[in-house]
Amino acid sequence: MMLIRVLANLLILQLSYAQKSSELVIGGDECNINEHRSLVVLFNSSGALCGGTLINQEYVLTAAHCDMPNMQILLGVHSASVLNDDEQARDPEEKYFCLSSNNDTKWDKDIMLIRLNRPVNNSVHIAPLTLPSSPPRLGAICRIMGWGAITSPNETYPDASQCANINILRYSLCQAVYRGMPAQSRIVCAGILRGGKGSCKGDSGGPLICNAQLQGIVSAGGDPCAQPRVPVLYIRVFDYTDWIQSIIEGNRTVTCPP
């Protein structure tokens, strides 16, 4: 418990001095303390900050660009200043990346699977999230959450995790905003067309949850965040479920989808 308190104190510092290269939830509200049992926070003492999702007792899914030296992983956290009795701390044992020589890699290979150094115990505030059984539906209302900035471009960070609802949008809308996006990729385009809500700095690697399934991983967005008609790019988890399950089942040499 003392280790968790020390790590929580480091997290408070991260939320005060978070790097400006990650992503956050703008326009959200404080999450219900029981609605983000799968949400994890990744950070280190150098100022890196990301989210992630617990998908079983030993594995966390996040964005590849969230890789950092001396990574610490906290689970069961709601508030940086108020400790939950069931918070748990873990270190990464192994990290798996979806490497590719494809020129479009930056658009659809931003995924990292982390095996924890020891299994997590399910508790009141900790439980894994289900992987998707099908891709997200266009127009679906989905949930984002994290400890990312709540203002942009002058970032301020919350004490407690923030949640917001956004919509699955047409891929062509993101393609029109982000120059160089290919005609097709393993990206989910999501946000609010009028702006005002969205993932932002500090939320990278965190979940896009639709119908209680992990459909996306926060990858990239606009700057400033949550601008009208500037959606956020989420890695489409459904396309990687075979890769993820193969690694969990012990196949460490499995290749990513092309």
Curated annotation (Swiss-Prot):
The active site is at H65 (charge relay system), D110 (charge relay system), S204 (charge relay system). Residues 1-18 form the signal peptide. Residues 25-249 form the Peptidase S1 domain. Residues 19-24 form a propeptide. Inhibited by EDTA, but not PMSF and beta-mercaptoethanole. Its main location: secreted. GO terms for molecular function: serine-type endopeptidase activity; toxin activity. Expressed by the venom gland. It is found in: Secreted. Belongs to the peptidase S1 family. Snake venom subfamily. Negative results: does not activate factor XIII, and does not degrade gamma chain of fibrinogen. PANTHER family: KALLIKREIN-1, KALLIKREIN-RELATED. Monomer. This is Thrombin-like enzyme chitribrisin. It comes from Trimeresurus albolabris.
